[in-house]
């Protein structure tokens, strides 16, 4: 029973047998806490339960919670691999009581589990309590039989937990085990407490107070329990090993790494193997929960984790990307407990492969930049810390690699400046990171929602109804009436108008009343979750509170919206079939005339894949199967295979939309081919969609793709317009529609050939008879002191060709300097300066090109001592630029 998986199941089953609900781990991206970057404790998903904001159908719970501590306040990243217990990803086992049992029962359960079920030696255990918590002290004596010296009173915040400056709080009791005197360290509270001999593995938090203000603390009417046990630490104890990396799970991951590399860990390399094993876990779980590598926020932290592991893989001698080849081993170890790993396996592999491929390229580029930036430094100098950070931040070039590369030359790195730059970047990441909290609604809607309650939505059954005006709002204030020509918003007691949500736009239409009252609805919005607000203008009459109205949704528009919304479901499932189970929705927009669908995928979709997606979706349209909706419990829906939008918060009951007959008959899913949790409006049969045409595919963020599509008459019009364009192109090319692609290819090849010939002719002309330098020499070559200078201004030569001209010029003169200004058609200029190898000690091409650039109205320029380039906005100053180079050479 000492394996990680067995320990996890033993813990959960123990508390289930003692009346606790086993609650699945929440995602690593917190749904209900915008203050956190990542979930870092088991209580995070219950925060609103503890504060009384949210009610659950149970009062006792137990979980095994995925946690990440990397970035922000809790950051273990730099320690991982070099200590026995630090991890970026770990599992927190916990049991929770929401106003049910309290301190005595919590201690009883904990003691029974660790001594009976886990079989720990009582004589090796000791606990801490908050120094004023006499109750906990007495309970440990009573239940465990501890003597006073094994119940240590701690006066610091280590033994008092608080949710924040205000809110629930209370004392803690931590359970420790003495692992023996072969490990350095002392008991908690002693000078040697930072050692690893006495290992804390379970923290019991007794939430019995509420911090009202900084000075005022009161008793909670219903105290609660929150506990957290580190699974990896418990495995360490149960398996009798000194480090979490020696437990079965990590041994298997390290063995897989060794097998992939062809050699195992030794004293010099063991830290790298450990880093890879830990970072593989955090990277994989973050990707499976929807985080993808980027340069800001959560994605920035993930990229740091990934690239740190990839750097260690390279240190171990990996010649090719390694991380993606280890995912199978992680899925084998943890996929049973966390099915999301299995579902996202392909996405995780591809994300790691692409990131490591990019990283290897940036390493090569980074080394080249490092060489250039440090070229003028000598032994004992310090490399600029800001430049070191730019290498890290822009090129993914780690600081330790910069230090290693410069160490052999006796050059250090200004780490203080690097750290300052890092802190600025972290602040930027925090500012750019938008948490997961809901945006605050306008203040006016709070009292209205309190007074009116939720709006009854009738739109699933009808698009026409009667309603009564419950509230009117004008210019952000409640109003008694709206007159003809006035714009405002109104709330009805019931409505068939769909309010914008779930990506579907709000309905439009008209509201008609006696006496010629007509209100044109231009949008319908949802405030505070369930208050439907109709926005528009009074076209005639006067609208008053209590007015009875006939409510008419724009039926044609709603019909098109329904078709586009149902099409998004079919496209979603078709994408999964073509690209893999990792496909997960990240957003959508459903309008009457188009749709877009954003989803997780690490690379562009090929034309062939798009065609297959379109064909599969249209096959289901042609089935003309009935679209069914049913309301069921959220857990029942998920067990039935219903897809949910990542990060969306669902109630206890959800609406499930199913469509597609054929796959159901094959037994793929009992509910249908496409089954999603959805509150939107849909067609009655798939055939009502008419036709689905994919019109675009693009990237919207790192690892997130977007598909755009049309349905019905909009798709037909798009097809007709496309055919008309094809016919026009065929007529212009004097060929058939079928032969248009081949004809265009032939014309493009012919154009490329002519462009090459023209470029060659221009270069020959430039070197043989172009406008010469200011001295007027026909060849453009003159002596500056004892050095030849070929200085020419040419027109119609692209920047990329100027370098080859400079190379040709260097060959012609044998020894000297070549300066060529190319003037473009819009009057701008580019300049290239080349210096033959024998003269680079006297003349630096970078310095010369910068002088010329300044004369052209530009600044800067870069390259190598033997070849550099720059540009400027004023091509008319080409003679002055060449003269400036000559002057600079003369003064050298």
Curated annotation (Swiss-Prot):
Subcellular location: Cytoplasm
Keywords assigned: Aminoacyl-tRNA synthetase, ATP-binding, Cytoplasm, Ligase, Metal-binding, Nucleotide-binding, Protein biosynthesis, RNA-binding, tRNA-binding, Zinc
Molecular function via GO: alanine-tRNA ligase activity; aminoacyl-tRNA deacylase activity; ATP binding; tRNA binding; zinc ion binding
Cofactor: Zn(2+)
GO biological process annotation, one example: negative regulation of DNA-templated transcription
Cofactor note: Binds 1 zinc ion per subunit.
EC category name: ligase
Gene Ontology CC: one annotated term: cytosol
Residue numbers binding Zn(2+): 565, 569, 678, 682
Main localization, broad class: cytoplasm
Disordered, as annotated region: 857-876
Domain notes: Consists of three domains; the N-terminal catalytic domain, the editing domain and the C-terminal C-Ala domain. The editing domain removes incorrectly charged amino acids, while the C-Ala domain, along with tRNA(Ala), serves as a bridge to cooperatively bring together the editing and aminoacylation centers thus stimulating deacylation of misacylated tRNAs.
Function, as annotated: Catalyzes the attachment of alanine to tRNA(Ala) in a two-step reaction: alanine is first activated by ATP to form Ala-AMP and then transferred to the acceptor end of tRNA(Ala). Also edits incorrectly charged Ser-tRNA(Ala) and Gly-tRNA(Ala) via its editing domain.
Family: Belongs to the class-II aminoacyl-tRNA synthetase family.
Protein's UniProt name: Alanine--tRNA ligase
Gene that encodes it: alaS
